[in-house]
């Protein structure tokens, strides 16, 4: 009999901004670490791959995102603009013009929201079956 696929649940009611989202990811997708995961999308991408105490590297699993519509709103344009403004403060000087363009787009409601970026990162992982509830 095939082994049942592991299910990990993120709950949109547990966060309303990017910082709280990272806390939820750490609570639900890591275990036994004596350090905190990075608070950035690259670290999130790494956690999705596994090896942080909840699922093994490249193990197939279902990621159930409860209250996803709330998260879609919470991680919409306002949070996206904040995210890009912070990125502008720390980006390499050669990237400033690109980031400024991203910020202008976000302020005009074009480009990708944080929600869309996060969903895109998840969908890059073939071992993840994403369920939005």
Model-identified regions with their sequence ranges:
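N-terminal intrinsically disordered, low-complexity segments enriched in P/E/S/T
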Residues: 1-35, 39, 43, 50-133
